[in-house]
């Protein structure tokens, strides 16, 4: 009692340490295993935490084959896999493959150089230090939602993540956003018994909304089941509702709850603090997804900054393959570093 927690150090150095056990991080670990490299994955949540955080009744836009990893088939009951099916799939793949994953272990910093990285992490027992020859960051973006940046956004009735409709039954809910997450949440809330208003700054929701959701949403608006307030920018949030700026002037929208779903941006703290060079809001990357710090790679969403619409599990898998192929060649001494 009273003594500071000590930093526990893992003695063995691994060839590859992967930060993040989402689909792309797991894919990187699978490639490490296939290529004969020792690996360790550190994840601050559970395996496939990103998928776990999706709305409970969400259906993927991609077909099952496009989000499979490691050659393991994903069997879905419908034409598209559900959140639950994908979550169980990724966790079972990690289990069957015997991937070395430490969950509920948050990475705090990455230091060092190619061949001798030190990764500091924290679990419930305190801080731990890990050694690795190469580091692959696959932290994704779902834990870093975009914010409105307006007064009142931190009030307790304002949410930046949507799970399910049950807590909002019979209440006035304003959903802010115009893409998949917002439209899907609005429909789910309506069917769960909430009184829903969707607020969006554009003239209409984005045409990229999932093709099976868009006509459903349009029909609910036409029949008056969901109210759509377009060309509206949120100025402030109060305990009673939202102040909106519209072409016709300032307007107040009463709401018991406000769900802000305006997209996400890649988590970049680890990369920036490790000294990675950025081009605008995206890290500089080689064709093998190596950053400006030799031996430190970034794959999946974390390589795209705010442009999260350009990366999916499907192309993130290719990032992981390219990065691990390059790492394996260097570990074996087959290819000199450019």
Residue ranges and their predicted role:
Residues 1, 10-14, 18-44, 161-206, ...:
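Rossmann-like dinucleotide/flavin-binding elements
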Residues 14-17, 21-99, 183-212, 279-280, ...:
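Beta1-alpha1 glycine-rich phosphate/pyrophosphate-binding loop at the start
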Residues 25, 48, 109, 142-144, ...:
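Glycine-rich nucleotide phosphate-binding loop and flanking beta-alpha elements
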Residues 96-132, 191-280, 331, 335-338:
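A Rossmann-like FAD-binding core segment of flavoenzymes
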Residues 112-115, 125-213:
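Predominantly flavin-linked oxidoreductase catalytic cores and closely associated redox partners
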Residues 134, 138-163, 248-286, 313:
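Glycine-rich beta-alpha-beta "Rossmann" dinucleotide-binding loop(s) and their flanking helix/strand
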């Amino acid at each position: 009692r009273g003594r500071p927690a000590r930093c526990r150090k893992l003695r063995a150095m691994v060839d590859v340490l992967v930060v993040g056990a989402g689909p792309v991080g797991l894919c990187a670990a699978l490639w490490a295993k296939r290529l004969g490299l020792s690996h360790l994955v550190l994840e601050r949540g559970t395996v496939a935490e990103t998928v776990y955080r999706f709305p409970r009744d969400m259906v993927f836009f991609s077909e099952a084959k496009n989000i499979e990893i490691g050659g393991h088939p994903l069997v879905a009951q419908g034409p598209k896999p559900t959140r639950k099916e994908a979550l169980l799939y990724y966790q079972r793949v990690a289990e069957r493959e015997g991937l070395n994953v430490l969950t509920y272990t948050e990475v705090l910093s990455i230091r060092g150089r190619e061949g001798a990285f030190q990764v500091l992490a924290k679990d419930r027992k305190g801080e731990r230090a890990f050694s690795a020859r190469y580091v692959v960051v696959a932290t994704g973006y779902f834990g870093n939602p975009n914010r409105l940046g307006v007064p009142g956004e931190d009030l307790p009735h304002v949410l930046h993540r949507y799970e399910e409709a049950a807590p909002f039954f019979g209440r006035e809910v304003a959903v802010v956003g115009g893409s998949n997450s917002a439209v899907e949440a609005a429909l789910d809330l309506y069917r769960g018994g909430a009184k829903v208003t969707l607020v969006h700054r554009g003239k209409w929701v984005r045409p990229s909304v999932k093709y099976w959701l868009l006509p459903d949403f349009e029909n609910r608006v036409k029949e008056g089941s969901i109210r759509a307030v377009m060309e509206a920018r949120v100025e402030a949030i109060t305990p009673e509702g939202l102040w909106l700026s519209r072409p016709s002037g300032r307007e107040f929208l009463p709401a018991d709850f406000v769900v802000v779903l305006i997209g996400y941006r890649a988590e970049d703290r680890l990369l920036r603090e490790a000294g990675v060079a950025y081009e605008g809001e995206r890290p500089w990357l080689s064709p093998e997804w190596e950053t400006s710090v030799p031996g430190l790679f970034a794959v999946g969403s974390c390589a795209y900054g705010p442009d999260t619409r350009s990366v999916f599990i499907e192309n993130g898998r290719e990032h992981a393959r390219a990065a691990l192929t390059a790492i394996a060649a260097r570990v074996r001494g087959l290819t000199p570093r450019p």
